[in-house]
Design a protein with these regions (language model features):
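Pepsin/retropepsin-fold aspartyl endopeptidases
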Residues: 18-313
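Bacterial N-terminal signal peptides
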Residues: 5-15
């Protein structure tokens, strides 16, 4: 959604507020029963229950009703747009934008781009906020007590406020994110093709569904990882590579989802003449199939890295 990114960039260009007290060195979050961390966040006139995500960039994304309770108003002229995309619940929704001052419980306030959507984007919370928006030098997401024999894995991330990690497979540069809200590891078609070409996985005749938002079911083809295969030191386990509905029907005749063959660039690998790559840049979301073996995941802003404490079975 390039238009959405452009609006967010415009909002971030607003002059910064006066200097505030230094953020804490370490801030700790604990995951709930769903496997995600949550935090009360004051947004204008309301305190909202917000899921803290590991894989978004700096933005607050809200359901419509909580945004109304908070008294948010869209930015003049550019603050309301309708988008169509397979990733959107129902395939189409109205997005409203503005810059909002938020105060997460226990942390200093911060101004972030706020986006509220006419269709529900979270059914377990009022909205979603990236861990990168929390003002602390390090944020520890604690999932359980650390068992004996655990190892520490360090993953360099892209920049100070960013959450993404970049690696290379063959001639593809792949964006990698950690995602506690996904039970499996999901990727787009170009990333899946890169894993297969590198000999790390093979395609299986099975289809599953990625459900990133309520009412969204996007088909993927299962990839079987090679025994012992890893990526950035993380084991490859339950893998799904995005496919179109027509591809899903070919793989499994009973496959049904909410996406269409059009407007779904995550399912495109290479153009018909094989000379020019199409679709979105390759990306992989590392899900709970891997991250459930971690007892602690730390967003280390000061050292621009992720630190994972895990005991892989």
């Amino acid at each position: 959604m390039r238009a959405l990114a452009a609006v967010a960039a415009l909002l971030l260009a607003v002059p910064a507020a006066a200097a505030r007290p230094a953020p804490p060195a370490v801030f700790t979050l604990k995951t709930g029963a769903s496997g995600n961390p949550y935090l009360p966040v004051a947004v204008k006139n309301a305190t909202l229950n917000i899921r803290i995500a590991l894989s978004f960039d700096t933005a607050l994304i809200l359901n419509q009703a909580p945004a109304t309770r908070a008294g948010l108003k869209p930015f003049p002229f550019l603050g309301k747009r309708t988008f169509k995309n397979a990733m959107i619940p129902g395939g189409e929704a109205t997005f409203r934008f503005n810059l909002a001052s938020i105060t997460p419980a226990g942390l200093p306030p911060k101004k972030v781009p706020a986006v509220w959507v006419s269709r529900a984007i979270a059914d377990d919370a009022d909205g979603i906020l990236t861990v990168g928006a929390l003002k602390a030098d390090r944020i520890d997401v604690v999932m359980r007590d650390t068992p004996p024999g655990s190892q520490t894995l360090i993953l360099k991330k892209n920049g100070s406020g960013e959450t993404g990690i970049t690696t290379r497979l063959g001639d593809e540069e792949i964006d990698i994110s950690l995602e506690l809200n996904s039970p499996t590891t999901v990727m787009n078609a170009r990333a899946g093709a890169a894993l297969v070409a590198a000999g790390l996985a093979r395609r299986a005749n099975a289809v599953g569904y990625w459900r990133p938002f309520p009412g969204v079911a996007l088909p993927w083809q299962r990839l079987e990882p090679r025994a012992g295969a890893t990526l950035l030191g993380l084991p490859l386990r339950q893998l799904g590579s995005r496919v179109s509905e027509s591809e899903a029907r070919r793989i499994a005749a009973a496959a049904r989802g909410t996406s269409t063959d059009s407007d779904d660039a995550d399912t495109i690998t290479v153009s018909a003449d094989r000379r020019k790559k199409r679709g979105r840049e390759p990306w992989i979301l590392i899900g709970r199939d891997v991250l459930d073996d971690c007892s602690r995941i730390s967003f280390d802003r000061a050292n621009e890295r992720w630190v994972l404490t895990c005991k892989f079975s």
